[in-house]
Structure formats: structure tokens, C-alpha cells
């Protein structure tokens, strides 16, 4: 695979959609439950949910351009024995009043607005990053991908860990700033600065859609 010191190649890119599951971004999901029951936690659901139309637009643009769309989802066993995160820190997980991203439950499903199409990969992870202990790298290499465009939630945790993992696997990374979000806007902005400084080209949805259209036109 080519060196990440070179710039991103949108013509050899894949869209990675991270954790757009009901428990993270649906108004009846686990994060929304925290926002209602523990407002002091500062979970900004409107900010998280504002990613949905941007992610949908990007997924449609990648499909139109003939580029792959790959879903990454965080799912755990009902007893949380395979979980790699202390969910009790945010009032979820073992002993909580409701399951959180448990495999086979509604909360762990990709939201209806962003359901994968036939033939699109769904990569299940147990921790934060999409590359750690998953087949993601093999899937991307098989498709000839050199650049990953990353969207989803949350900016400071699973999104940023996936970006860092991509760099470590020698991919060129693009982070779409209006298609990612954190539970807190201030920490979101801080993480975007870190990403732009060290790990990824930070773009808007409009910019990435234009890049895809330009690459498609160049092939024709």
C-alpha cells in the first residue's frame, strides 16, 4: 500500500461509517436516555443527530461514484463479557436499566435512514477503533482502497481511534467535520484540531462530494 505521506486519493477511497447505531444517534436510544435522565452529563443529542443527513448524502455520493461504503458498528454480548469499554462510567452496561449496543437488540442496529445496501460490508468491533481485531484492513486492501473517508460518532472516541488506526495501517485519512459529532461540542472542536494537525485531512461534506464528482468526471 502506498505511503500516507502522499495526499489522499479520492478515486481510491472508501467511506467508513462509524457507529451510526440507534443507541448512539436515535432520539430513543441509549445516549438520548442519558441526555433525558442525567442532563448534567451534557449529552448534546441534537448535535449528534445533525450528522445523519450529511452521512446519508456522503453514502449516496460514494455509491454514485462507484466507491465502496463500509459500515463499522460497536456491538457486545448481552453479558458484556467481550466489551472493551467500562460502560458503567456513563451509566450504561451491566446493571443498567436498559441494554446498550447489545448484539441482536434494536439499539445496536444501524439507524433506518442509513441502512447498508446489498453487498456493503458491516464490520463489528468490540472496542473503539474500526481496525483493531477486525477484518477491516483486509476488506479495504482487497478493494484496492488507499484513502479512508471517516464519518460517524463519536469524534473523540471511536471516530478518532479509527482515524489513528487507519494511519497506523498506512491509509490516507479524510475526516468529514460536519458528518462527525461528539456528545460535547467543545471537545469535538478540540479533537478536530488534533486530527487536522496530525492524522487527517479535515473536509466538509460539500468538499468531499465535489472531490468525488471531479474524480468521476476525470475517469469519463
Give the predicted meaning of each segment:
Residues 1-16, 23, 28-32, 56-65, ...:
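Active-site-adjacent betaalpha module
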Residues 22, 47, 73-76:
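Short glycine-rich, polar/acidic loop-and-turn segments at beta strand-coil junctions
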Residues 37-53, 94-105:
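A short acidic, glycine-rich active-site loop
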Residues 70-72, 204:
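A structural signal for short, well-ordered beta-strand segments and their strand-loop junctions
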